[in-house]
Amino acid sequence: MKKVCAMASTIFNPEKPKQSFNELEAVGLHEVMFDFGLIISPEGILIDRSSEEPKFKPQKTRKSYQTIIKQFAEHGFMPSIARLPFVDVRLNPGNIYQYKELNNLILQVNIDCIRACEEMGCYDIIIQPLFAGLKPEEQWEANKAFFLTLASACQNKNTRLLLINQCQNFNGHLVRGVCSDGMDAAKWLDALNQEAGRACFGFCLDVGICNLCGQNMQSMAMALDKRIWAVILTENDGKNFAKLLPFTNAYGRSSTMDWLSAVRGLRDICFDGYLILETVDTTVAFSPLLQPYLFPVYKALLDYFAMQINIENDLKKYNQVVLFGAGNMCRNYMKCYGKKYPPLFTCDNNPKLWNTEFEGLQVKNPDELKTLPKDCGVIICNIFYREIENQLRAMGIKNIGYFNDEYMPSFYFERLKREVEPEEERSL
């Protein structure tokens, strides 16, 4: 799984990105999604054309992003995924002639940007479907012609064009737009790949758009399945178009975003593509002096989501597993994965639990882990992950996995209660 940050959230000066690159690499982030929308805008060109002294010059714009790409190359930070310029879904050009002109501009700009992507070796490209001025019954034919034209402009057989789900403006409200229905989007992709004669089309799932459209992300992911090559992780309040840091739009001590269905869906399809963190509205709300301190949080969030999505894939790596922990998390493991990936036993640091049975497992002294076969993994089922991981590494154990029960297929809603000895109670 590739962990990526959006360019606007992390590269503060695209023409002089060295400091941003150094700060990203210092926390273990090695890639950003190249965003052509920071350099060129089809709607901006349209507005510029109507002015008395147009400023847009195609050659000048091309030189601008070539200069930025050169900076990326010089610092060894070349992207493998890019996003072409998007048109604001709230845009209202005014008349049908401007819509047509806008869509023609989008095609021209996208072809130019695709060529730039291929020149820098970036072959996964996120492209916004056409929507401006199109009636629902016109959307498929217009986008079919649009995307097949873009595919024919690709000069490298490895180039993949990723459609993305959209919302639309309806009397000031953001509602479901083009490619917002998973089954319809899947049909579009299959038809486009068939017409193109090769699998050059895929999908980028923006979970923020799903939230604005009030969608179940698990159903969306399962409808698209392996067609999903990239996922944009961002948050909003379900009403306003925003790109916020996950878990920051909180109310009542919890996020208002349906992360449960997002993680479950990506886990169901064994997603292993690009995880793209996009947080530009949160980032720019901070002073430039504080923004670099967000980078470790970005890395932690990407690692966290990758871990959650990969929980079952990580279990498949080992021929046998043993659990560490004999509490609520162990119980949830046994409920959700106990039959499919049965543990040999579990262990716990509490001596009072040794040689007892919990959820059908024998509870042993952690010292027993020293005798495990080499192909056996130790899965930490306890909230004190870092402490237990250090303990295991000190014992010479290398095959360490993590289990977390926040986004399980099903839950025990009653928490496990154990009797507390008087001396233990006094120490709490």
Predicted ranges, named:
Residues 33, 81, 126, 162, ...:
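Conserved beta-strand positions in the central sheet of alpha/beta enzyme cores
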Residues 33, 162-164, 204-206, 211, ...:
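Generic enzyme active-site microenvironment
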Residues 7-11, 37-39, 84-87, 130-132, ...:
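Active-site beta-loop-alpha junctions enriched in small/polar residues
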Residues 294-428:
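Hydrophobic, well-ordered beta-alpha structural blocks that scaffold small-molecule cofactor pockets
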Residues 1-122, 155, 198-200, 299, ...:
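N-terminal pre-domain/capping segments
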Residues 74, 89-202, 212, 300, ...:
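Active-site acidic/histidine proton-transfer and metal-coordination neighborhood
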Residues 1-5, 14-28, 121, 182-205, ...:
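Histidine-acidic metal/acid-base catalytic patches
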Residues 48-63, 97-108, 135-146, 173-184, ...:
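Alpha-helix N-cap and loop-to-helix initiation/capping positions
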